[in-house]
């Protein structure tokens, strides 16, 4: 559960094993009595050619501004090929404690096939941490595992939004740049460097390495 200023966001997660690559699956979500409509998703296929979508700073501060999600969904729906995953580079919402916006956000993720039927790879921006210092809601929506402990680095300094995920011949690295760990910014940056060196070495065979974070590496201001 994630507490917000005017309610509690509750969610459940399920891990499914034994799935085959490049396969369509259908499912329903229910409580034993009430059930959703039948939904579908497709697992990643073993290929080096695929599409993905990317967006960021949708940052809705009101229900009216959630129309930005509909605009993003329209763009995704017009892609020649259904994207394998959707890359969100942060600030998907204005404040993590806005229960009303998260309710509508959850509705869109649930109802719009452009979001509901593809994987979500999310980086955490500063607004994910506003109103909720642990960014619980976006962590739940994201669903990818954080960096695990290793002798070479301290995962507490990396933040839970730091992780790597593979798609075909691509490696996607997300850095939790807004994370405020128990160390100085320079020490945290050093931990990122050590962790990335390990991950890039382990995935040297990947043709494409994509690093995503909410802030530009070379800001123009």
Regions found by a protein language model. Name each.
Residues 68-75, 195:
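Well-ordered alpha-helical segments embedded in enzymatic catalytic cores
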Residues 2, 53-71, 94-100, 181-188:
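Acidic/histidine-rich helix-loop elements
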Residues 59-62, 76-80, 96, 124, ...:
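Sec/Tat-exported extracytoplasmic proteins
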Residues 60, 93, 128-129, 178-180, ...:
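Short, solvent-exposed loop/turn segments at secondary-structure junctions
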Residues 24-40, 98-207:
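Extended active-site neighborhood of metal-dependent phosphoesterases/phosphodiesterases
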Residues 1-62, 74-83, 209:
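Acidic, histidine-bearing metal-coordination/catalytic regions of metal-dependent phosphoesterases
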Residues 53-56, 85-91, 119-126, 175, ...:
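Active-site neighborhood of phospho(di)ester-bond hydrolases with catalytic His/Asp-centered motifs
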Residues 90-93, 203-221:
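Short acidic, glycine-rich surface-loop motifs adjacent to enzyme active sites
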């Amino acid at each position: 559960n994630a507490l917000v200023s005017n309610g509690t966001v509750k969610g459940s997660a399920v891990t499914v094993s034994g799935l085959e690559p490049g396969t369509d699956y259908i499912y329903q979500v229910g409580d034993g009595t009430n059930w959703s409509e039948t939904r579908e998703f497709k697992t990643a296929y073993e290929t080096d050619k695929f599409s993905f979508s990317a967006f960021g700073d949708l940052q809705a501060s009101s229900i009216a501004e959630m129309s930005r999600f509909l605009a993003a969904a329209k763009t995704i729906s017009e892609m020649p090929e259904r994207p394998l995953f959707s890359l969100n580079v942060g600030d998907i919402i204005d404040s993590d404690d806005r229960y009303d916006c998260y309710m509508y956000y959850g509705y869109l993720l649930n109802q719009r096939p452009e979001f509901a039927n593809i994987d979500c790879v999310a980086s955490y921006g500063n607004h994910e941490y506003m109103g909720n210092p642990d960014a619980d809601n976006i962590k739940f929506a994201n669903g990818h595992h954080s960096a695990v402990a290793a002798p070479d680095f301290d995962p507490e300094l990396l933040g839970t939004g730091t992780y790597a995920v593979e798609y075909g011949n691509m490696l996607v690295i997300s850095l939790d740049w807004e994370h405020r760990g128990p160390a100085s910014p320079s020490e945290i940056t050093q931990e990122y460097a050590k962790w990335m060196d390990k991950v890039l070495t382990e995935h040297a065979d990947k043709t494409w390495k994509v690093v995503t974070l909410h802030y530009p590496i070379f800001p123009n201001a």
